[in-house]
Amino acid sequence: MKFGKTPDAVGRYRLSTAAEEDLIGIALFGDEHFGIAQSNRYRDQLERRFTMLADQPLLYPAVDHLREGYRRSVCGVHSIFYRIDGNDVKIIRVLKNQELEKQL
């Protein structure tokens, strides 16, 4: 999944390679620890948030103190870090909140 868009979306989102890897890790962990059905629901929740970020990219605050140009949206136990890129949003990372300092 590299691009996402809903029919009425203003913009779209793109996933970085690191974000794709983060989502694979989330899926594997979720499947093993919470079961496939719950894991799928959580991934759907993340995907809905990505779509919302594409539609309303300024909704969440900038976190320039962590990384210049980044914004952060918390979804469940994960923080979604993204940048606004023209009319699109680039999802940079999807990290557990306790991984932030190590990964950014």
At which residue positions do the language-model features occur?
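Short proline/glycine- and basic residue-enriched helix-capping loop/turn segments at helix->loop/beta transitions
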Residues: 51-55
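Enriched for short, Lys/Arg-rich terminal
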Residues: 78-104
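Arg/Lys-rich, positively charged N-terminal/basic patches that mediate binding to nucleic acids
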Residues: 1-41
